[in-house]
Amino acid sequence: MISRRDLLLQMAAFPFLATASQPRTPIKFDVPPGACDCHTHIFGDPKRFPMTPSRVYTPEPALVDEMRTLHRALHMDRVVIVQPSIYGTDNACTLEAVKQLGSRARAIAVIDVQTPGSDTMLADMDAAGVRGIRLNLETSGIADPAVGSQRVRAAIDRLRGSRWHIQMNTRLPMIDAIRAQVAGAPVRFVFDHFGGAQAPLGLDQPGFRSLLDLVRGGSAYVKISGAYRSSTQAPNFPDVTPFAKALVAANPQRVLWGTDWPHPDSATVAGRKNTDIAPLLQIDDGALLNQLAVWAPDAALRTRILVSNPAELYGF
């Protein structure tokens, strides 16, 4: 566990480290009332919210007040805070953030789906604003379809009969492998960040058709979020546009939008230990939100994506 003293020492040793990014580009369309940023994280004071020793990376802090500033600039009224991998199954930081933000916030938690848990625990978390659990196969380095399928099966069994959904951070080959499981599941699925599509590989890359089919059939939602994880063409990531438009065309009732703020650098970096500070990526969320008007030019479609879909899925 990294102590606050160690964190401050590391930050002092690297004075170029920036704080969580804020939008630099003004929003160029009318954001509808009730709009929701469906993908964010909070990284709290490490002394109060210790990170799991097995984490892949150590981010800089990103606090609730910084998120409030972000959302004022983006005209976002609602937010979904997703439990990051650095805390494992200790959801305290995420739940504290939801508590601070009140009824405008919901959470996605991480639980141990391999171990039977109590329904009371889920009920308590539901009352605190949790609406689903996350399977973060990507950050965990899980690419084996057999392992992924087993995790999905355990998660389905754990949530059977509840109103929660399963949110997955994975890549298209995994989605292709679990397509039948998702389509036949008694719970809803949400795939992060374009399902892990890589823009340079084009629309015909393996697995994207499976994602489209799941979205089209209503079995899964997809977040058109974190475009910089699919593309290197900053700041507008134009090569992501065909993917976003294809997903919106497939089923606009199953599309969500999110920033992925504060943009953690969770990738494995040669020579960087998991306890070394991984500077937050400096992403212009104003430019990213403006791209939604390119991906969904119709104002009614944007209202569906930003307001109606999140309200239905997260129970705002």
Describe these PLM feature segments.
Residues M1-F14:
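N-terminal secretory signal peptides and thylakoid transit peptides that target proteins
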Residues C36-T40, V79-V82, A107-A109, I133-L135, ...:
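Hydrophobic faces of well-ordered beta-strands that scaffold small-molecule active sites
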Residues L63-E66, D90-C93, G117-T120, I175-D176, ...:
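Alpha-helical scaffolding within the catalytic cores
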Residues R68, L95-E96, R179, L212, ...:
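Active-site phosphate/pyrophosphate- and oxyanion-stabilizing loops and adjacent acidic/basic residues
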Residues I86-P173, A180-A183, R216, Y221-P235, ...:
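Active-site gating/metal-coordination segments in enzymes
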